[in-house]
């Protein structure tokens, strides 16, 4: 679950601009695609259902809200202007800003801690038990040893090194 050097450099550059917009930088994906690359930024705001209602700039009452379109627009403008000045991406690129959504991708091991007991989809770099793809229940996150523990098909438990995780997503369930 490590970012490439290019993605890490972009993350470090973008993070202050995103946080200045009052939201958290959940993660980024930088996808070189021939002549036109894609920079996808995921932003989030923890939903606090116990928070006091707040009146926003439009005079509307908000209670522990997540990310809205206006947040994405604000971050797009802020980050877009910064990228235009610093120009860290050679060639043309598209900038996308969105919430992580129901099937949120995970970019850091720490992010998984809030989802223990839930189903996740994993794509591994090296096969474990002759498989690279799993849908499993997340049982534990061990930050010290940098691994997760999952239950596969309700049958057996696997310990997976976080450096072997190519991609991890939440599986949304009602």
UniProtKB/Swiss-Prot annotation:
It holds the Pfam family RimP_N. Signal peptide: none annotated. Gene3D superfamilies: Ribosome maturation factor RimP, C-terminal domain (2.30.30.180), RimP-like superfamily, N-terminal (3.30.300.70). It is found in: Cytoplasm. One of its GO terms (biological process) is ribosomal small subunit assembly. Required for maturation of 30S ribosomal subunits. Belongs to the RimP family. This is Ribosome maturation factor RimP. The gene is rimP.
């Amino acid at each position: 679950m490590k970012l490439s050097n290019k993605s890490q450099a972009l993350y470090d550059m973008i993070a202050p601009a995103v946080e200045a917009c009052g939201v958290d930088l959940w993660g980024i994906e930088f996808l070189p695609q021939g002549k036109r690359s894609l920079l996808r930024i995921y932003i989030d705001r923890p939903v606090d259902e116990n928070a006091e209602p707040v009146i926003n700039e439009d005079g509307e009452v908000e209670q522990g809200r997540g990310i809205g379109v206006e947040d994405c627009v604000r971050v797009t403008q802020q980050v877009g202007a910064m990228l235009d000045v610093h120009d860290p991406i050679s060639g043309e690129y598209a900038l996308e800003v969105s919430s992580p959504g129901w099937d949120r991708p995970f970019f850091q091991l720490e992010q998984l801690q809030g989802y223990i007991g839930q189903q996740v989809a994993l794509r591994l770099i090296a096969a474990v038990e002759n498989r690279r793809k799993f849908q499993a229940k997340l049982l534990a996150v061990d930050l010290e040893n940098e691994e997760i523990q999952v239950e596969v098909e309700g049958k057996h438990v696997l310990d997976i090194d976080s450096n072997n995780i190519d991609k991890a997503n939440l599986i949304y369930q009602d």
